[in-house]
Structure formats: structure tokens, C-alpha cells
């Protein structure tokens, strides 16, 4: 599979994507109608609380990467350039990204490649299950790229992956972090309920005012409806959602989204700082200080969330096993 990071096409209408090619950076954002991406922008300096020392390479990190490569699998940790990769891999956890590494959406905050994806690998659910067994994992997170090219948007592939993991690893807990299925939420839940997960996660990402810029192709109401319908179908399965801050939203808007999530039955919450993957992505408007994350967590508890992980480096699947146990993550 090749990667394209080239210069911006002269004319967008003349730009033809090739199937199976991963378009990143300038090649990806050149086809996004967002006006505030300036590759020559001055980057906001990172404050002291955002500076971390990455651990050295370890046998555990190499083992997880080898396990992924051996089965031709992908981790969102690597594909999305997560800042917690070394910590999580050293901890022996990884988030599997199914249905390939090419997304049909082109969200300008995300470092996952855009393009025309290849057909699904029907053996992938089994490969994921075998990798989970090889790694002796007790808790796994399964996420995916958006697959708007598929009739069911990938719901059946999620269900098959959960089924295969549970069949081979009956003691393993499975959390799925799903896309919005392009609004076909009732159809998706009907498929997913054949093999329900232990935790159902779908990220709202940010506030509705900024959706056109942050999540082109998504719809705030679709996402809330997906979370609501799944919770109605499975009232005893925790539902979870994540938000990024630092994109130009206000704290008041974040609190309103948190209340919307509670009103739709969501019981678990993650809030973390947005980090700009490259100059060809949305810029960081501000770095939210730790005390404001503490405020979000306090407000989440007041609203009735059963668990809220809020902190600069928190991501949706960051220490997901500890989140599911109700332990403090920040």
C-alpha cells in the first residue's frame, strides 16, 4: 500500500484518488473545504504540562507491533499518531483498527489517511481474535475507519469481530468504538445486537457549532441518536463518548454537550486536549490547563456520569480497561 503526502493539486476537480492509496497531510487536506487550515501558520507553543518524555523502545512495544504486522492488522495508536502509544504499548494494550487504514472521511483534526479503501478482508475478524489470544489480552478496544462506501457502513464487520474475539477468548472484555454509520443508526444497532460488546463507545469529538469544520460529513444529532438507541436496546451495557478541547469551543459549550450525552443515556466520558498532527491539520486554538479538566470531571460527576476520564493526554481508549473498572484516569 502506498502513501501520498504530496503537494496540493492545482485544480481540485482534476484530482483523482487511486484506490488503496493513503492520502495524508497536504494531499488529504487539499480536498477539505475548511478555510482555517494554513500550512504556514505559527504553531502555538506547548505549555509545560503538555511536555512529556517518551519512554525508550522496549520488548513489549516491539512484541505488539510484531503481532499486528504478522496478521496484517492496524492499530489506531499508530495510524492516528496517538501521543500515548509508547505508554499503552508498554502497558500491553492496543486499540485495533479494523476495515483497513484508509478512511472515507477527511476530518481535518485526524491523522488517519483518507482515500478510496480496499475491499474488506473477510478473515480480519478471525485474525484479530487470534492476535488477542496471542497477546493474552483481557480487555481490547476495537475501532475502525469510516467506511461510507459499504452498504451497512461496516456494522456487520464489527459484529463479526466481536463474535470471533469472544469465541476464542471467552474471558476477554470487548469495547467497540464505532463511527456514526452515516446516520443509519437503527440498521447498525440491529446488526450490532447480534454480538453485543461489553462497552459501546462513539465519540462526539467536539461541539455542534464547530461540526462543519471539525467533522465534515458528520451530524451531531446522528451521533446522539446512535448512543441513545443502543442504550435503549441494551440498558445494562455502558455507553461512552469522548470529546477534544482546544479547537475554539468554550467551556460552556463543552458542558452543554456533556449534558446532551447524559440526556441520551451515556454513562462514561473522556475529555482530552486536541493536538495538531501536522501543519496541514486544524490548529490548536488553546491549551486547556489541568485545573479546567478537573472542573470537567467534577461537573461530569455532578451530572451523573458513572466514570469520567478528563486530562490533557486522555484519549477515548486511553487505559480503557481501567476506565471500565471505574478507576481514576487523567
UniProtKB/Swiss-Prot annotation:
Superkingdom, natural source: Bacteria
UniProt entry tagged with the keyword Cytoplasm: yes
Binding residue positions for [4Fe-4S] cluster 2: 103, 107, 110
Pfam family, one: Radical_SAM
Domain Radical SAM core positions: 89-306
Pathway linked to the protein: Protein modification; protein lipoylation via endogenous pathway; protein N(6)-(lipoyl)lysine from octanoyl-[acyl-carrier-protein]: step 2/2
Catalytic activity: [[Fe-S] cluster scaffold protein carrying a second [4Fe-4S](2+) cluster] + N(6)-octanoyl-L-lysyl-[protein] + 2 oxidized [2Fe-2S]-[ferredoxin] + 2 S-adenosyl-L-methionine + 4 H(+) = [[Fe-S] cluster scaffold protein] + N(6)-[(R)-dihydrolipoyl]-L-lysyl-[protein] + 4 Fe(3+) + 2 hydrogen sulfide + 2 5'-deoxyadenosine + 2 L-methionine + 2 reduced [2Fe-2S]-[ferredoxin]
Residues that coordinate or bind [4Fe-4S] cluster 1: 77, 82, 88, 317
Cofactor dependence: [4Fe-4S] cluster
The enzyme's E.C. designation: 2.8.1.8
Name of the molecule in the record: Lipoyl synthase
Organism field: Actinobacillus pleuropneumoniae serotype 5b (strain L20)
Amino acid at each position: 500500500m502506498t502513501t501520498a503526502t504530496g503537494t496540493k493539486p492545482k485544480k481540485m476537480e482534476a484530482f483523482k484518488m487511486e484506490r488503496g492509496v493513503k492520502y495524508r497531510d497536504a494531499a488529504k487536506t487539499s480536498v477539505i473545504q475548511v478555510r482555517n487550515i494554513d500550512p504556514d501558520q505559527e504553531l502555538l507553543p506547548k505549555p509545560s504540562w503538555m511536555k512529556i518524555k517518551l519512554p525508550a523502545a522496549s520488548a513489549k512495544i516491539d512484541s505488539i507491533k510484531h503481532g499486528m504486522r504478522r496478521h496484517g492488522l492496524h492499530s489506531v495508536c499508530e495510524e492516528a499518531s496517538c501521543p500515548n502509544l509508547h505508554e499503552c504499548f508498554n502497558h500491553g494494550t492496543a486499540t485495533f483498527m479494523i476495515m483497513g487504514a484508509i478512511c472515507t472521511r477527511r476530518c481535518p483534526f485526524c491523522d488517519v489517511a483518507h482515500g478510496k479503501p480496499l475491499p474488506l478482508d473477510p478473515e480480519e475478524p478471525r485474525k484479530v481474535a487470534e492476535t488477542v489470544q496471542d497477546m493474552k489480552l483481557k480487555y481490547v478496544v476495537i475501532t475502525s475507519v469510516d467506511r461510507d462506501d459499504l452498504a451497512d457502513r461496516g456494522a456487520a464487520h464489527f459484529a463479526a469481530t466481536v463474535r470471533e474475539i469472544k469465541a476464542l477468548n471467552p474471558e476477554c472484555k470487548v469495547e467497540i468504538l464505532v463511527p456514526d454509520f452515516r446516520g443509519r443508526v437503527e440498521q447498525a444497532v440491529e446488526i450490532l445486537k447480534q454480538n453485543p460488546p461489553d462497552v459501546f463507545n462513539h465519540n462526539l469529538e467536539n461541539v455542534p457549532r464547530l461540526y462543519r469544520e471539525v467533522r465534515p460529513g458528520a451530524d451531531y444529532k446522528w451521533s446522539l441518536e446512535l448512543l441513545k438507541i443502543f442504550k435503549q436496546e441494551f440498558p445494562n451495557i455502558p455507553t461512552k463518548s469522548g470529546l477534544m478541547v482546544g479547537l475554539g469551543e468554550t467551556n460552556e459549550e463543552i458542558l452543554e454537550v456533556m449534558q446532551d450525552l447524559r440526556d441520551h443515556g451515556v454513562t462514561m466520558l473522556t475529555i482530552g486536549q486536541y493536538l495538531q498532527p501536522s501543519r496541514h491539520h486544524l490548529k490548536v486554538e488553546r491549551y486547556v490547563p489541568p485545573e479546567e479538566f478537573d472542573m470537567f470531571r467534577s461537573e461530569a460527576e455532578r451530572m451523573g456520569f458513572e466514570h469520567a476520564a478528563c486530562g490533557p493526554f486522555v484519549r477515548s481508549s486511553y487505559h480503557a480497561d481501567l476506565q471500565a473498572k471505574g478507576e481514576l484516569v487523567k
